[in-house]
Amino acid sequence: MSTPPASVGPDSRDWRREGIRVVRAKRRSGDTPATLGMNREVAISGSRTGSRLLWAGTNRIEGGAKTGAHHHGELESIIYVVHGEALMRWGDRLEFITKAGPGDFLHVPAWLPHQELNASAEDELHCVLVRSGPEELVVNLELDAAAEPEWISWD
């Protein structure tokens, strides 16, 4: 475990103002870059909460819907599935696919072209997203997607 800098301590910062922040559900904002097919809301970011290293928010995808292909540049992403089943395609031609359900985490490396799909035709897919930088970055892509992606499983 690393030693905190000498400046860290009860007298070093205004912990009341710079400490824990709660962002209520009603305070999340849809004013964030998103990919066609998803409803993304930001909760934690540099501009909203002063975060220096992380971005966090939620994502909803309607039943039967899918996002466009995209990547998040140098940012890594963690996706936690809250409700529904997510299909994730990835690769230069979206040639790989996997499935994740409630309680599952997905790690999306930096620069990875990917696409989220809702596996259900009826139920909405709900996820929590965390990125390795304080602001959202979305680069939408036009890819010639593979017709039959290869299934990858970690079971």
Regions found by a protein language model. Give the residues of each.
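A short, N-terminal "cap"/entry segment at the start of jelly-roll beta-barrel domains
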Residues: 1-53, 68-69, 140-155
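Conserved short histidine dyad/triad with adjacent acidic residue
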Residues: 40, 44, 57-73, 110
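Short, charged/polar surface micro-motifs in flexible loops or helix N-caps
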Residues: 48-52, 61-65, 83-87, 136
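Short strand-connecting beta-turns/loops that link adjacent beta-strands
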Residues: 49, 74, 93, 121-122
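Short glycine/proline-enriched turns and hinge-like loops at secondary-structure junctions
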Residues: 53-54, 72, 100, 119-121
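A short hydrophobic beta-strand segment most commonly corresponding to one strand
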Residues: 59, 78, 107, 122-141
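A short beta-strand-loop-beta hairpin characteristic of the jelly-roll/cupin
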Residues: 66, 74-102
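Conserved metal-binding segment of the jelly-roll/cupin
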Residues: 90, 100-120, 130-132
